[in-house]
A protein has these predicted regions:
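Pan-zinc metallopeptidase signature
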Residues: 105-129
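The catalytic-center signature of Zn2+-dependent metalloproteases
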Residues: 34-107
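Short, exposed beta-strand "edge-strand" segments with a Pro/Gly-rich flavor and a Y/T-containing core
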Residues: 16-20, 102-109
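Solvent-exposed, flexible loop/coil residues
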Residues: 8-11, 23, 58, 69, ...
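General N-terminal targeting signals
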Residues: 8-10, 38, 82, 115-117, ...
């Protein structure tokens, strides 16, 4: 496992309120393909209220962010043009920090994900030290 974090509605203000990452996922670490530090970005995304891009697969409300394209399963590489939910709009978000793509592939959050993190911060983390 490269890292983990609790969602803010489950742990904010408790001893479980933290982000944990494997040192090998940090720059210079031994987790080949996953050692540029993007695991930390991914886990902070969870800590700020984001689900995986593949949450719920091709059905339902997915990651609860409307501008994140649906994805049936995680991407462990960087397959451009991948579309595991052809009946849903958009290609798989392989460049999104909340997928499992290689660190070299992860470059973005959607605008909706940023709004969700802002909302979660205001609700669960604002004013905490």
């Amino acid at each position: 496992m490269l890292g983990w974090a609790r969602f803010p509605w489950r742990a904010a203000g408790t001893e479980l309120d933290h982000v944990s990452v494997n040192v090998d996922s940090m720059p210079g670490g031994r987790a080949a393909g996953y050692n540029a530090g993007d695991t930390l970005v991914h886990e902070v995304g969870h800590w700020m209220g984001l689900f995986h891009t593949f949450q719920g697969g091709c059905e339902g409300s997915g990651d609860l962010v409307v501008d994140t394209a649906a994805e049936a399963e995680p991407e462990f590489d960087c397959t451009e043009g991948r579309d595991t939910c052809p009946d849903q709009p958009g290609l798989d978000p392989v460049h999104n920090f909340m997928d499992y793509s290689l660190d070299s592939c992860m470059t973005e959050f959607t605008a909706g994900q940023v709004r969700r993190m802002d909302t979660a911060f205001a609700q669960y983390r604002s004013g905490r030290s």
